[in-house]
């Protein structure tokens, strides 16, 4: 036995390294098999449902260990292969902590996104769990220095390892069939992906790689079936053309997209301090339309997905980013294009660099006339929200009227840092992350108040519609209250002031409903593209859905919209 371990230490050690790394990859979202079995009380979990997915993990580890069968002298090749995978796991774990899903492989090529904000975020997320994946590799390298070259393996061993891996995947496939029942084909779990982390846990990491490669190289074409499904959905959409909720005068349209704003921060006092008093004052003003129960519908593109939803009324992809994969040479119907028909000029202003999330190319696809990033106002460092908002006032004043200004904040992006001048908000009985987030939004609120004052002093505010919308959620209400999360904790916000309507929408809706609502308020209902949502002024919303199947309400058309949007984007429907 001892001699067998010595002869096979590289193969065995490599296999163990990948088992641990794969376990750490699965743990953040769904909970790894070994993690659950070691940390949970027996009887508190379904043993079979927990154990069977482990066969898929072992199959993955066997496939990933295959290089160890062909290496003898150059063991560093195997060590480098393991280290590379461990680095991948560490990055994915940090991504999962924020986005609750695995990062698509295409995002690893987005070097333009690497900036100070991203590096600070990564530093705040890196913890002991990310280091655990590397520990078996360190032990393997240390032990390997004292042992002779590993044995040479023949074809039979290679075939045996591959056979064991296939057996593990077969167990996983059988489990999927029994779990899903007769309503799904045996291939459905492998050809349809709602969440990447779920695909990895259910089907395996190696099948996930195969799926990602196949979908990346398969050309996207709009089939006749795609067109029928799209047009069937659109035929059932409301087709109103009146502008009953718009001012007869053409007002400037100013949209402030607030980074990571959860609606629970509005109309809330913590430790005697009103978190966002300036924005709160808008909620209770005549001419304000407010919806504070918007289900966040962003996915892998996060902020860029939010911008895409708000400007087009389309939903993002359930895997991948529209901004990085489907913005080049595209022309989407949008707010900017709807307003341009009525003589509006437009610009998009952001705090970071144009290359981050491919923002400039997305802005072109959305029809903006001008795009300003941090290089327009500085040497290339990210702008503060305060500096961006002040620059925006000058740009609005200098633009031909009417103007559509799309302004994107950044400083409330996590990780939240200790404030230079803390208020009583820092004394909240909650994790530091929550306290620092409250302080960050309190500061941003003051900057938004200053922005509105500057518009007022220059005679611009009284002739403008100002919309404040969330790009997505981040610090959910359960984190403040110290309890298990619910969907209600994630709600985002839309506040539009300067309109001829006063209305508060108290029922849940989706981010996809922002676009048709803004069309309604801006008097652009002659524009043929109304989006996949519904104007919140036309009827009380009944439902909202997320791509993982989460449904609020009973209208399943909101789930269907995800499939329709995917077909529109991937098939380049608007190029017809």
Give each language-model segment a name.
Residues 7, 73, 121-124, 215, ...:
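Membrane-interface junctions
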Residues 2-208:
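Transmembrane and membrane-interface helices of multi-pass
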Residues 228-576:
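Solvent-exposed soluble domains appended to multi-pass membrane proteins
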Residues 99-111, 120-128, 195, 207, ...:
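General structural signal for secondary-structure boundaries
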């Amino acid at each position: 036995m001892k001699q067998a371990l010595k002869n096979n230490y590289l193969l065995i050690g490599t296999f163990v390294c990948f088992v641990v790394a794969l376990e750490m990859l699965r743990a953040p979202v769904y909970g790894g098999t070994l993690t659950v079995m070691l940390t949970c009380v027996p009887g508190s979990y379904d043993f079979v449902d927990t154990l069977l997915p482990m066969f898929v993990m072992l199959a993955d580890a066997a496939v990933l260990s295959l290089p160890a069968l062909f290496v003898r002298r150059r063991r560093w090749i195997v060590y480098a292969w393991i280290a590379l995978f461990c680095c991948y796991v560490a990055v994915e774990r940090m991504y999962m902590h924020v986005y609750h899903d695995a990062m698509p492989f295409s995002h690893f090529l987005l070097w333009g996104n690497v900036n100070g904000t991203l590096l600070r975020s990564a530093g705040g997320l890196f913890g002991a769990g990310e280091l655990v994946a590397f520990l078996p590799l360190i032990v393997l390298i240390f032990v390997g220095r004292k042992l002779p070259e590993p044995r040479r393996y023949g074809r039979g061993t290679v075939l045996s390892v591959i056979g064991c891996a296939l057996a593990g995947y077969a167990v996983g496939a059988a489990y999927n069939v029994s779990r899903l029942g007769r309503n799904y084909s045996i291939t459905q779990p492998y050809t349809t992906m709602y969440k990447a982390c779920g695909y990895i846990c259910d089907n395996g990491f190696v099948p996930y790689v195969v799926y990602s490669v196949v979908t990346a190289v398969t050309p996207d074409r709009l089939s006749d079936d795609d067109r029928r499904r799209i047009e069937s959905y659109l035929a059932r959409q409301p087709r109103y053309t009146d502008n009953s909720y718009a001012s007869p005068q053409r007002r400037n349209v100013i949209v402030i997209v607030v980074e990571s704003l959860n609606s629970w921060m509005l109309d809330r006092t913590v430790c005697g301090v009103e978190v966002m008093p300036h924005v709160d004052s808008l909620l209770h003003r005549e001419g304000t339309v407010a919806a504070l129960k918007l289900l966040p519908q962003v996915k892998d593109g996060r902020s860029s997905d939010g911008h895409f939803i708000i400007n087009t009324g389309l939903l993002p992809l359930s895997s991948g980013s529209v901004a990085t994969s489907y913005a080049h040479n595209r022309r989407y119907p949008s707010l900017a294009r709807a307003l341009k028909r009525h003589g509006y000029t437009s610009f998009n202003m952001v705090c970071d660099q144009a290359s981050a999330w491919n923002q400039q190319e997305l802005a072109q696809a959305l029809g903006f006339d001008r795009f300003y990033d941090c290089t327009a106002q500085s040497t290339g460092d990210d702008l503060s929200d305060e500096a961006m908002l002040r620059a925006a006032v000058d740009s609005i004043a200098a633009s031909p009227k009417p103007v559509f200004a799309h302004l994107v904040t950044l400083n409330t992006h996590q990780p939240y840092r200790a404030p230079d001048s803390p208020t009583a908000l820092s004394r909240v009985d909650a994790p530091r992350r929550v306290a620092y987030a409250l302080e960050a939004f309190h500061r941003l609120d003051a900057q938004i108040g200053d922005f509105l004052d500057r518009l007022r002093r220059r005679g611009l505010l009284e002739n403008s519609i100002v919309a404040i919308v969330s790009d997505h959620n981040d610090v959910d209400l359960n984190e403040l209250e110290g309890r298990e999360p619910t969907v209600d904790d994630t709600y985002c916000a839309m506040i539009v002031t300067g309109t001829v309507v006063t209305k508060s929408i108290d029922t849940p809706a989706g981010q996809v409903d922002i676009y048709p609502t803004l069309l309604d308020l801006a008097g652009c209902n002659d524009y043929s593209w109304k989006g996949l949502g519904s104007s919140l002024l036309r009827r009380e919303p009944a439902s909202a859905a997320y791509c993982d199947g989460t449904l609020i309400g009973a209208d399943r058309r909101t789930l269907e919209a995800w499939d329709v949007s995917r077909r529109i984007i991937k098939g380049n429907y608007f190029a017809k």
